[in-house]
């Protein structure tokens, strides 16, 4: 096992990784920007290094600086967390070349799955169903219009290198396509350095269901059941739960086997998530594969009793998976909500100083955060400031527990999306387990315009 690990990330996920490392007696090294001096991940780590100014391009994305710190601190592994450099093949390759273990899959797999077009091709070759769409890059808006007519509107125009809902737009006709193409291409180039676009037939009112997989270096691949992430705003997840209320035993078996098949097809190693859309007839379509730990990993931990960060470390250290497929538990129900520093109606960011931060306590309540009273939420990073996770024997009990916890959750000094979360869990469509990705648009009193 590793002796010292650098966490190439910030905020709650860095705190989460540090916690497991401490459990395994692994020393930890944190990195931080000038804006994160007071973040809990800096305080919890054994060592912490200032790496730059607040903008991520001047701190958390500086590969050379992070590797210099890693060498200076004498670490033998780097955990990338999620976001930032977690799915950056160049970073993973630089770690390997520096003789430092990268806690994740190989650079080649990250690169392959980082291109949605390449991922589609790989899955089709493996016999994993994909959404009908273009299998090569779109040359221009006229080709996009031609193919959209071929597949039939509405379609989703997507950036091949995209993620987090950026560079993705629902298009309903030729006029919208011509308006959307150049803007999406420009946005994708700005965010990802790659303006390659493709399109897929839009799946109307689908469920967004993903499967957690784990693969070691000894040929073993397992899935750890599914998560339902259908509650989204601007194509970004807000509420996640496991298991999915929509998935019956037959579908659970089918989607789990498909996820394992997908992982084996690309010789995957470590933890990953196979994301799918499932329509009303329970047809499954591969969407993408995330080659990292997910924000919503705690709900899987709650229903299995498995520490997923520990599994990442074990696999990266060359050990075998602790469980075979038939040994992985599935007990109870868990729901996670993301607490965002944002206006609950417009979704615009709400930076500011946290003046009060009081968390609910009790059985089946879990928190992940890196903030505290006096902490300044800045506009430099993702607005998620905390996660609230509840678990119970049944979904109904979990919803009740979540409702009580949200009533007791106190955070002052910034606006948060807690009022919106209360709307979600109190809505009869959500309570009935019938929510699709159109839930927020169709059922909540929100303005779904983009952030300025």
From Swiss-Prot:
Keyword Endoplasmic reticulum: no
EC number from the UniProt entry: 6.3.4.14
PROSITE patterns: ATP_GRASP, BC, CPSASE_1, CPSASE_2
Cofactor(s) it depends on: Mg(2+); Mn(2+)
Gene: accC
Domain ATP-grasp: 120-317
Listed name of the protein: Biotin carboxylase
Catalysed reactions, as listed in the record: N(6)-biotinyl-L-lysyl-[protein] + hydrogencarbonate + ATP = N(6)-carboxybiotinyl-L-lysyl-[protein] + ADP + phosphate + H(+)
Binding site for ATP: 116, 158, 164-165, 200-203, 208, 235, 275, 288
Binding site for Mg(2+) 2: 288, 290
């Amino acid at each position: 096992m590793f002796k010292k690990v650098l966490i190439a990330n910030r905020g709650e996920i860095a705190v989460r990784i540090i916690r497991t490392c401490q459990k395994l007696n692994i020393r930890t090294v944190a990195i931080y920007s000038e804006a994160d001096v007071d973040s809990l991940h800096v305080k919890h780590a054994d060592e912490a290094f200032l790496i730059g100014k607040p903008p991520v391009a001047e701190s958390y994305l500086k590969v050379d600086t992070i590797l210099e710190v890693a060498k200076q601190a004498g670490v033998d592994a780097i955990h990338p967390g999620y976001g930032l450099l977690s799915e950056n093949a160049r970073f993973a390759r630089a770690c390997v070349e520096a003789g430092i273990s990268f806690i994740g899959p190989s650079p080649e797999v990250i690169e392959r799955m980082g291109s949605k077009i390449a991922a589609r091709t790989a899955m089709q070759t493996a016999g994993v169903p994909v959404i009908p769409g273009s299998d090569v890059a779109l040359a221009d808006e006229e080709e996009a219009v031609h193919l959209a007519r071929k597949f039939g509107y509405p379609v989703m125009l997507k950036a091949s290198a995209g993620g987090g809902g950026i560079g993705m737009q629902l298009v309903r006709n030729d006029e919208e396509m011509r308006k959307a193409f150049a803007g999406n291409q420009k946005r994708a180039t700005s965010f990802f350095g790659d303006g390659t676009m493709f399109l897929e037939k839009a799946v109307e009112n689908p469920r967004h269901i993903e499967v957690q997989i784990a693969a070691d270096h000894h040929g073993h691949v397992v899935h750890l059941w599914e998560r339902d992430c259908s509650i989204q705003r601007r194509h970004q997840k807000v509420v996640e739960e496991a298991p999915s209320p929509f998935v019956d035993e037959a579908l659970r078996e089918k989607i789990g086997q498909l996820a394992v098949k997908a992982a084996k097809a690309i010789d995957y190693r470590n933890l990953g998530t196979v994301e799918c859309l499932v329509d009303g007839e329970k047809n499954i379509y591969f969407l993408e594969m995330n080659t990292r730990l997910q924000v919503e990993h705690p709900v899987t931990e709650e229903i299995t009793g498995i520490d997923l960060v520990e599994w990442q470390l074990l696999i990266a250290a060359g050990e075998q998976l602790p469980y075979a497929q038939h040994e992985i538990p599935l007990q109870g129900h868990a729901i996670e909500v993301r607490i965002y520093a944002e206006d609950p109606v417009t979704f615009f960011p709400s930076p500011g100083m946290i003046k009060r931060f009081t968390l609910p306590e009790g059985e089946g309540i879990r928190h992940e955060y890196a903030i505290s009273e006096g902490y300044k939420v800045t506009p430099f990073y993702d607005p998620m400031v905390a996660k609230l996770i509840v678990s119970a024997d049944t979904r109904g009990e979990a919803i009740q527990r979540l409702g009580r916890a949200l009533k007791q959750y106190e955070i002052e000094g910034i606006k948060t999306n807690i009022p919106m979360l209360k709307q979600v869990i109190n809505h009869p469509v959500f309570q009935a387990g019938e929510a699709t990705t159109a839930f927020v648009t169709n059922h909540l009193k929100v303005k779904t315009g983009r952030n300025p």
